[in-house]
Amino acid sequence: MMIIIPNNEIAKHMLTDFFAKHWGTPEMAISSGIFRCDELDGFAAVNESGEIIGCITYTIDGKDCEIISLDSMIENKGIGTALLQQVEEKAKHAHCQRIKLITTNDNVNAIAFYQKRGYQFAAVFPNAVEKARRLKPEIPEVAENGILIRDEILFSKVID
């Protein structure tokens, strides 16, 4: 069993620890800048023990909602989908026109996940991870699946 709650209802140290454990730091670096995920709006999936088992963060800027991070600790249980739906609803209520997000070329699971949920390729930024790596040198060169981490892929979805 899980419940979805806004990140601002969770002790900040729990969010900081979650991102540090899964990303090495609460900072998310993409070519457009560095974001402190533990300080962003978002939602967390929490199990019956109060442990965070998934988290999504986002920003809203005018008519755009940008998802900065989405993590699910247990695959294929609907956690990522439930979190994504929460942000999509929030974006609708904020009168956003689209939701966008960036992932990297090595993240084949995320690429499939977003396409199955109606997100489309909007752009590919070759070698963009080099810029992000200058901001956050901890970004590895090669993913666990053996793919070089090199390009950023922008996905977007128009909000009805």
Curated annotation (Swiss-Prot):
Residues annotated as domain N-acetyltransferase: 2-140
Source organism, top-level taxon: Bacteria
Xref: InterPro entries: Acyl_CoA_acyltransferase, GNAT_dom, N-term/lysine_N-AcTrnsfr
Gene Ontology terms for molecular function: acyltransferase activity, transferring groups other than amino-acyl groups
This protein's name: Uncharacterized protein YdhI
Species of the source: Bacillus subtilis (strain 168)
